[in-house]
Amino acid sequence: DFFFQGLNTPR
């Protein structure tokens, strides 16, 4: 939700 906003990954 910070970098991978499109993926929305927990990492």
UniProtKB/Swiss-Prot annotation:
Q: Which GO terms describe its cellular component?
A: apoplast
User: Which terms are listed as keywords in the entry?
Assistant: Apoplast, Manganese, Metal-binding, Secreted
Subcellular location, in the record's words? Secreted, Extracellular space, Apoplast
Residues annotated as transmembrane: none
- Gene Ontology terms for molecular function: metal ion binding
Domain of life from the UniProt record: Eukaryota
Q: How does it assemble?
A: Oligomer (believed to be a pentamer but probably hexamer).
The family assignment reads:
Belongs to the germin family.
Instruction: Tell me the function of this protein.
Output: May play a role in plant defense. Probably has no oxalate oxidase activity even if the active site is conserved.
Q: What is this protein called?
A: Germin-like protein 4
Origin organism lineage? Eukaryota, Viridiplantae, Streptophyta, Embryophyta, Tracheophyta
